[in-house]
C-alpha cells in the first residue's frame, strides 16, 4: 500500500516536488495538492486526477492524506505545522523552517510534545559535491578558515510584489543553506556571528549579506550571499595546515591540493537533492526513525539567521547564537 502525501505549494519550487512525487518514488502517491491561486487551474506537471484545495486546512484534514509536504513562504509555516500537529500527521517543511527562531522553536516544541515527525528540507545536505567535501576536507587538517559564496539571480516574477513588513530577504531565503552547511560539514554549532546587510528588514528585504561565523572549536567562516542580475555562483573553499580544498555545487566539482603538492580531484555524481530529501522523509516515516534533518536542525539554522539580523541591526557587532532550541 502506498504512502499518500499531500503537497502544500505548487509554485516554481513546488512543481519540482510534484514531479518527483508523481514519477520517482515507488510506493508513494500524491494524494492531494493545495495551491493559493487555484483559479489558474491545474499545474501543467500534474497529469493525474489529484484533488486540489485552496485552503491548506482542507488538505491536511483530508483522510486520504497520511503525510504533509510544505513548499510555501516561511511566514505561514508555523500555522501549517500546528495544523498538521492537530491532525497527527508527519510533516516535511522546505527551508527555512520559519521566519524567526521564536516561531521555529514553537514549531519544534509542538511537534515533539505530540511525538510526531518533523523534517526540514535543507536540501543542500544531499548535494553530491557537499557530501564529498564533508568526507574529504579533514585531509587538510584543522580548518583555519573557510569561505562560502552563494549568488543567485533575482526572481523575475517578484519585481511587482510589495514586500511584507519587516520581511527578511536573501540571507534567510537561500543563505540559510550556508548557515546550515557550516554545522553539517563541521559537526559543530555556530556560536557567534557578525553580519552586514545592504538594508535592514525594516527598510526592505536584504539582497546582500556578508557574514562571519565562528564555531564551537573556533573555526572561522566568511559567507558572501547576494541576489545578482546574472551569473549564479555556488562554491566554498577551505584552508588548513595540510592543504586546501574547494567545492562548487553549481558546476558539481570538488578539488584540492595537499602540502606535498599532490593535486586532488574527485568525480562528482550529481544527485537530485529534492528527490533525495523526499526519499529520506518517506524512509523516516516507514521505519519510524528520526529524519536525517530534524526540526531542531532547521530551527538551529534559523536561530543563526536571527543572530545575523541582530548583528546587522547593531552595525555589525559580534552576537552570540542562542543554544537552547526550546528557549522562548
Feature roles, as predicted:
Residues 1, 67-70, 216, 283-328:
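C-terminal helix-rich "cap/oligomerization" subdomain common to oxidoreductases
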Residues 1-47:
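N-terminal Rossmann-like dinucleotide-binding module
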Residues 17, 48-110:
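Beta-loop-alpha module in the N-terminal Rossmann-like domain of NAD(P)-dependent dehydrogenases
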Residues 54, 93, 118-120, 247:
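Hydrophobic residues in well-ordered beta-strands that form the structural core
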Residues 106-123, 141-146:
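Rossmann-fold dehydrogenase core element
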Residues 124-202, 315:
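Predominantly a Rossmann-like dinucleotide-binding segment in NAD(P)-dependent oxidoreductases
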Residues 179-252, 278-289, 320, 327-328:
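Contiguous beta-strand/loop segments that form the cofactor/metal-binding neighborhood of enzyme cores
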Residues 266-279, 293:
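Active-site loop of classical SDR/Rossmann-like NAD(P)-dependent oxidoreductases
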